[in-house]
């Protein structure tokens, strides 16, 4: 994983790469944005780059030093992750804060990634705040959330805030094309457009729907098969209704709407 592999967040990843290159790092970062746009992935890439012993000129991790190898092999003792959705008690935070006292063994920093940080209990937030107010010099926190408004203002004020954008449809389509070519999957561009629209700005959702469509279509993703698999109403139906209305064919409109309802769609939408 590299910063360049993060889709649709170029300005944000450039800023993070520049921070790695300059060595001017904050003690706390807050990554905000909708689900599936790369917050946790970016946090991991950033954490690895921060501790890389020989970062590239572009601010990417070298993937060759001991710190990078340890991270890639999931045996790093300097990068910790906590899923606050399922570990949100004050005891969980206190256990994590105990780790901040021990300096890093390999690399420059101990990096703590707390995902879904808004799920922490009030007591846990208060316990975390004590460390955040006066963090050890060797500690960096990267917090990720989909609901920034639920985080205490005293926490937010101590973080550098990065707002992740929703994926655009063209960005999603371009990435899905790359995935399709890599996997040897053929596709119709209209089909990828339907998948991108269905993902609602989330790359993770887009990839999940893409995998589902690829399985259903047996490696040849077509528009007709995708709308059938995803139960999406064909756009031609809308045009047909408009044409019939312009021709004052009320009876035909009712027949078409009835057929749509019989397929399980809600005529009101």
Task: Enumerate the predicted regions with their spans.
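P-loop/Walker A NTP-binding region and its immediately flanking N-terminal helices
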Residues: 1-161, 179
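Extended, largely alpha-helical regulatory/partner-binding modules appended to the mid-to-C-terminal parts
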Residues: 73-76, 92-95, 108, 160-269
């Amino acid at each position: 994983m590299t910063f360049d592999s993060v889709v649709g967040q170029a300005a944000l990843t450039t800023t993070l790469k520049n921070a790695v290159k300059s060595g001017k790092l904050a003690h706390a970062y807050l990554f905000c944005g909708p689900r599936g746009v790369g917050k946790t992935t970016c946090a991991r890439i950033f954490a690895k780059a921060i501790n890389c012993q020989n970062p590239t000129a572009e601010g990417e991790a070298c993937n060759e030093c001991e710190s990078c190898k340890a991270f890639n092999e999931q045996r790093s003792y300097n990068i910790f992750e906590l899923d606050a959705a399922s570990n949100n008690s004050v005891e969980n935070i206190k256990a994590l804060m105990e780790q901040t006292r021990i300096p890093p063994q390999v690399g420059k920093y101990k990096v703590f990634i707390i995902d879904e940080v808004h799920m922490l209990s009030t007591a846990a937030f208060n316990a975390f705040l004590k460390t955040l107010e006066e963090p050890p010099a060797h500690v960096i926190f990267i917090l990720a959330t989909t609901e920034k408004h639920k985080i205490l203002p005293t926490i937010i004020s101590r973080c550098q805030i990065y707002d992740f954008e929703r994926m655009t449809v063209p960005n999603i389509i371009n990435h899905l094309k790359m995935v399709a070519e890599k996997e040897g999957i053929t596709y119709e561009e209209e089909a990828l457009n339907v998948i991108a629209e269905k993902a609602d700005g989330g790359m993770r959702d887009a990839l999940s729907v893409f995998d589902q469509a690829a399985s259903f279509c047996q490696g040849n993703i077509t528009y007709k098969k995708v709308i059938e698999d995803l139960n999406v109403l064909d756009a031609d139906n809308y045009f047909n209704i408009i044409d019939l209305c312009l021709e004052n064919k009320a009876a035909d409109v009712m027949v078409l709407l009835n057929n749509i309802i019989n397929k399980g769609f809600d005529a009101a939408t």
